[in-house]
């Protein structure tokens, strides 16, 4: 069987993205046919910063229609509008290739959200762009690994805004889309308030979550969704034995336990999208960029998910 062709966007070049591309190419090319969306000149510069430890001529790289950012010992690890613009154009090109079926999927390396903002990119990050590009699809951010996957009902929104987002109709739509995308038989749903609201004692949000769970199970015809569970104990070992699939109302409630348990191996998956997209479950790691310290396990798992 022919290997799948995967477009890999470079992420912010001042971080660990190019380092991961170079150090992982041999393993990645054994899994798929990688197409690196970055100019060859930048790969050469990155290799020089890594003391020419890697072979760059064997990499299939596609030049990006954007000004080349500076990349040297004085720019690495720093936020740059030019690097932000370049990482966005790399990502956008990946989506275009996936839309036209020129690649089978895309893997995105980490971007810096402040760099995107400085470059006046009107999106918070990758997932926000996908939600705008594919408005007819309910794009769901799911992070994790085979041992634990967490779907986020809300992702990059202020915590104070989450309460108003928790409405029965919207949550039912989300839960059904999550189940359809994952084919999970059991999904544990975390509550929003302490003790999952204590039957209405602490806020009304958990009552709405319960109604959404009941309606979703009724639609499916079986008891798929369990909860709302008190979030402080939802990820205890005995709970994780029930199912690897969870839903969290907010970003940190779901991702704090995930990253405490499986930080190095977790990935980010965009569910319910018309294209296949995964990403590493870590940021640009500016503090260790170009020091040969970047762990590539998350990156390789993101590729394996697509391949």
Curated annotation (Swiss-Prot):
Gene3D superfamilies: Isopropylmalate Dehydrogenase (3.40.718.10). One of its GO terms (biological process) is pyridoxine biosynthetic process. One of its GO terms (molecular function) is zinc ion binding. Keywords: Cobalt, Cytoplasm, Magnesium, Metal-binding, NAD, NADP, Oxidoreductase, Pyridoxine biosynthesis, Zinc. Pathway: Cofactor biosynthesis; pyridoxine 5'-phosphate biosynthesis; pyridoxine 5'-phosphate from D-erythrose 4-phosphate: step 4/5. GO terms for cellular component: cytoplasm. Its cofactor is Zn(2+); Mg(2+); Co(2+). It catalyses: 4-(phosphooxy)-L-threonine + NAD(+) = 3-amino-2-oxopropyl phosphate + CO2 + NADH. The keyword NADP applies. Substrate binds at residues 126-127, 259, 268, 277. Its main location: cytoplasm. Its EC number is 1.1.1.262. InterPro entries: PdxA_epsilonprot, PdxA_fam. It is an enzyme of class 1 (oxidoreductase). It is found in: Cytoplasm. Signal peptide: none annotated. HAMAP family: PdxA_Epsilonprot. The active site is located at the dimer interface. Homodimer. This is 4-hydroxythreonine-4-phosphate dehydrogenase. It comes from Helicobacter pylori (strain ATCC 700392 / 26695). The gene is pdxA.
